[in-house]
A protein has these predicted regions:
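Glycine-rich nucleophile elbow surrounding the catalytic serine of serine-hydrolase chemistry
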Residues: 114-124
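Residue in the alpha/beta-hydrolase core beta-strand immediately N-terminal to the catalytic nucleophile
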Residues: 64, 111, 135-137
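Conserved alpha/beta-hydrolase
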Residues: 48-76
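N-terminal cap/lid segment of alpha/beta-hydrolase-fold proteins
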Residues: 1-27
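Alpha/beta-hydrolase active-site loop
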Residues: 82-102
């Protein structure tokens, strides 16, 4: 049997509440797996996997990143993290959930799984906060030619400058 727990915590953006979920197995927990989801996803998309792993004694947990799933703020802007230093804020939200889990379930091996956009967040996370993690799964990741990345970043900056930080970018998506 696996028990689903939903809860909220304060985002590091200082304004928003983050929706998080734990799928907690009955009995002894052998491992905690934190899922860091991809672009245009939400953590409950991983529920079938979480239920399966829960039956094997693995607690699965994760949060909806800012602008995703049930963590979409009052502005209703899907996919928009925040205005100030979004990459750092999202990584710090992932870290906050890890700390909460380790405080509530101390001494249990901890693994983090990053999929797609979540793989980039996870790699950034591991660079900043890798201690206390016994394993990492990076899947659906990728790399692009430097010139293409620079071009996309330039387009994003121009759109942000003229259209505002919360504007939905045209031509830059999945």
């Amino acid at each position: 049997m696996v028990r689903k727990e939903e809860f909220l915590f304060d985002s590091r953006d200082g304004k928003s509440r983050i929706h998080a979920v734990r799928w907690v197995p009955e009995g002894k927990i052998c491992c905690i797996l934190q899922v860091v989801h991809g672009m245009a996803e939400f953590v409950e998309r991983y529920e079938p996997m979480a239920m399966y792993l829960g039956e094997k004694g693995i607690m699965v947990t994760g949060e909806d990143h800012l602008g995703h799933g049930k963590s979409v703020g009052e502005n209703g802007k899907y996919g928009f993290f925040c205005e100030q230093d979004p990459a750092t804020v999202v990584v710090r939200d992932v870290h906050r959930l890890k700390k909460m889990n380790q405080e509530e379930y101390p001494g249990i091996p901890y693994v983090i799984l990053g999929h797609s956009m979540g793989s980039f967040i996870t790699r950034n996370y591991l660079f900043r906060y890798g201690t206390g993690i016994q394993g990492a799964i990076i899947c659906g990741t990728g790399s692009q030619p430097k010139a293409l990345v620079k071009l996309c970043l330039m387009i994003e900056r121009v759109q942000r400058l003229f259209l505002g930080a919360g504007h939905v970018a045209k031509g830059i998506d999945k």
